[in-house]
Amino acid sequence: MLAFNNDYSHGAHPAVLQALVDTNMEPQPGYGTDAHTERAKQLIREACQAPDADVFLLVGGTQANATVIDMLLAPYEGVVAAETGHVACHEAGAIEFGGHKVLTIPGYEGKMHAEDLENYIHVFYENESYEHTVFPGAVYVSLSTEYGTLYSKAELAAIHAVCQKREIPLFVDGARLAYALAADECDITLPELAQLCDVFYIGGTKCGALCGEAVVFCGMHAPAHPIPRIKQHGALLAKGRLTGVQFEALFTDGLYFEIGRQAIQTAQALRRVLHERGYQFFLETPTNQQFVILPNEDMARIREHAAIEYWKKYDDTHTVVRFCTSWATTQEDIDALAAVL
């Protein structure tokens, strides 16, 4: 069975797995105080050109989102996100479970617009009863978005400017950051991203690691007592070496960026195949997620040979499905899918 339904179906990149094997019998202290975690943090700071950044390795994406948002907000505040943002629609209420509301504004192909954000905050404070409602206390975006689209440098800078004006932090979800940075259309580098937000995370789970995300506080220092707060969210591994070793490997010799390029190369090949077969795209995306409108009978036929992801109903006879590539996708996989299509 071919795997095109998501970008976390496989285990770890062989180099990451080998690093885990090579260090397996080393006794190391726990909870992220080991030498590999310290080395990984330093490599990440160097890659971000942010020597003073506070870096923490958490177990997964939901935990990273829930933990960071909770750390940023007062009890009476919520986080502003596009209505299609991951925390708004695909986190099973994890943010709300932590006591914070997700405040949604319009999304356009997965992205919020700076002017909508400014208008939302302006209208909030124009309301004479605003103290009786949930305050906008942080802003959430992702790179890439839930729909595989990208913020340009100008778009992200405009959102950041609103956040700075309103004195609220900007948080960038980077679950698929390797794939975003590798896209031809991306005009943001990792060091530039560190300058365009207050905190972001570098995705590992979807980008070559077995698990783990690296949270980087770059435009601000981490709030007080981060470790107990991370632990309260179940995001702190006792065997912190597991994420430390993986991110040490990912940020050695440019592996993280190589992983991104591999996924984008196969995504481009996949896009060409889908176009050649005459399929209609729900929207055009430059990253590793491709969204196609399939006749329902075609979807059923393809699923006999390849795993693809249901996204949404398009009409009574068509469905929007997602095809994903990852670091593990090969040209042979693309050729095999082409034969199925």
Give the ranges of each region predicted by the language model.
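Hydrophobic beta-strand scaffold residues
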Residues: V102-L103, L170-V172, F281, E309-Y310
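Catalytic PLP-binding core of fold-type I/II PLP enzymes
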Residues: Y151-A183
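Active-site C-terminal subdomain of aminotransferase-like
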Residues: F135-P136, Y140-T145, L150, I188-R277, ...
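PLP-dependent aminotransferase-class I/II
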Residues: G99-E146, Y151-A158
